[in-house]
Amino acid sequence: LILAFQFTEYAGTMREIGLLVLLAISTFFIHELGHVVFGIVAGYQFHFLTAGPITIERNRITANSSWAYFGGIASCSPKTDDLQKISRQHFLFAAGGPILSIVVAILSLTVGYFFNLQYVQFLGVMNFVIFLVTAIPFKGEFKSDGRVMLELLSKGNEKEQFLSTLLLIKEMMSPALPNMWSLHLVQQARTAPVNEDNITV
């Protein structure tokens, strides 16, 4: 009986942990989905969305093969070469994640409170935390969504270099062979200083 009680208690703890992990993955997915939806509405081409163990591509769903992407990543690229248009499009793409996160946070916290649903409230708290972490402008190993939006609203070499990087990604994602890529963009990539901002977007 003692062993059965201990097993039951352990199983309950594992169930709680499993539910929290599922809520965390759902939170990552919601945030990245916001990027994708706003990106597509803005005119971007969708490539893939990864959250937790799953990767969603345009025509299939596969297992995520990279732990680096477990926390979520959304890949979309511009269809145009117009830098002003790309600037507006990428601003919406960057804003989409935090916007959907805060909307889901408010809805989850409200529904969870009025119907006394603890896990729905947890989902709301997690989405609110993701909103704060991504909306506040900062630059560490990666730029936050807020930092990207701030740069896109500014003027100068940093913004131009960032937009050129987006154009180069567009070339890389296209069916065109490397020898058909824009020589101007390739030259810009060669002369750009080596740092995290110029190897990740």
Model-assigned labels for residue ranges:
Residues 1-20:
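Topogenic membrane-insertion module of multi-pass membrane proteins
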Residues 7-11, 37-49, 111-118, 139-143:
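Membrane-interface elements of multi-pass transporters and channels
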Residues 17-81:
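Small-residue-rich helix-interface/hinge motifs
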Residues 82-172:
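Hydrophobic transmembrane alpha-helical segments that form the core helix bundle
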Residues 161-164, 195-201:
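Generic helix N-cap/helix-start motif at coil->alpha-helix transitions
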Residues 171-187:
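Helix-turn-helix repeat elements of alpha-solenoid scaffolds
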Residues 187-196:
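Solenoid-like repeat scaffolds
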